[in-house]
Design a protein with these regions (language model features):
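PAPS/PAP-binding and catalytic site of the sulfotransferase fold
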Residues: 1-10, 175-202, 214, 222
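PAPS-dependent sulfotransferase catalytic domain
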Residues: 1-176, 244-276
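Short acidic (Asp/Glu) and glycine-rich catalytic loops that position anionic groups and cofactors
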Residues: 170-172, 189-194, 239-245
Length: 276
């Protein structure tokens, strides 16, 4: 999320951010609010999605019918576009795609070394590392408990999540690595601005000055201070959201068996992305 702040800070006047208000303007594509219309179509489907206390595969089968229609109904001024965020894989279930070229103009995908994801998510959820590895390498549905106005998130496993978006070639895309954003933020910011300009004719005014401000205001220490001062909606009850902001911590915190499990499951995609 620190890296998403880097992106959105470009859409402030000068590239500076001193709170998380701008993130609150970026809605989750999986917000329950976007599915209220189901009540007009099928009260049974509506009740299944909205009234239960937990989601299951039966609910998922119903929910997928409305993915594209929900996105079509999002109110965006004609001739403009909006930004959304999601953790979902671009899955196809019962002939229903999570999204398509009619509702998505383009996307930016940020990958991260799965060995570091395990550590980060383990802290975030207070699950042990072995259980978290199981989530990472096996097909997973997140958000089963109805919290924070969120529907199900279909993550699949790490490698298939990546592949699901990689295969979506009908719209412009930019694939970034968390590690590159940490190690060479200026280069990656330029890649992002080039992506917006070449595909959507969005030109950033005062680009060089903004880059300096973006780098300064979205550095990890500043984001952590903002979280400590103002809180952060996506912080878990178990740990700070902006916890360390480092890479390759897995080298010291995973045992050899844990490393092997992840690497054997995700080998081809890890090689493709330069993690192995």
């Amino acid at each position: 999320m620190a890296k998403i702040n880097t992106l959105w800070s470009f859409f402030t006047k000068d590239g500076n951010i001193d709170n998380f208000d701008i993130l609150n303007k970026i809605h989750k594509l999986d917000s329950l609010n976007y599915f209220e219309f189901i009540k007009e179509i099928s009260i049974n489907d509506y009740n299944l999605i909205f009234e239960g206390t937990e989601y299951d595969w039966k609910t998922l089968a119903v929910y997928t019918k409305y993915w594209i229609e929900a996105q079509k109904r999002i109110k965006i001024n004609e001739g403009t576009f909006a930004f959304f965020k999601t953790h979902n894989a671009r899955v196809k279930l019962k002939e229903n795609h999570y999204t398509n070229e009619l509702t998505t103009l383009g996307f930016i995908y940020i990958s991260r070394d799965p060995r570091d994801i395990v550590l980060s998510y383990s802290k975030h959820t207070n699950k042990d590392i072995d259980s978290t590895i199981d989530l990472l390498i096996n097909d997973t549905i997140m958000g089963k408990d109805k919290t924070k106005n969120r529907t199900l998130e279909v993550l699949l496993n790490w490698k298939d999540h990546y592949r699901s978006w990689k295969k979506f070639i009908k719209v412009p895309s930019l694939f970034l690595k968390y590690e590159d954003l940490v190690n060479d933020i200026e280069r990656e910011i330029n890649n992002i601005t080039d992506f917006f300009y070449s595909n959507f004719n969005i030109e950033i005014s005062n680009k060089n000055e903004k880059i300096k401000n973006v780098i300064k205001s979205t550095n990890f220490d500043n984001l952590k201070n903002m979280e400590n001062k103002n809180g952060f909606d996506e912080k878990s009850k178990y740990s700070d959201f902006f916890r360390s902001g480092k890479t390759k911590q897995w080298k010291n915190e995973l045992n050899q068996n844990q490393k092997n499990l992840i690497e054997q499951s995700c080998k081809n995609q890890m090689i493709e992305l330069g993690y192995m």
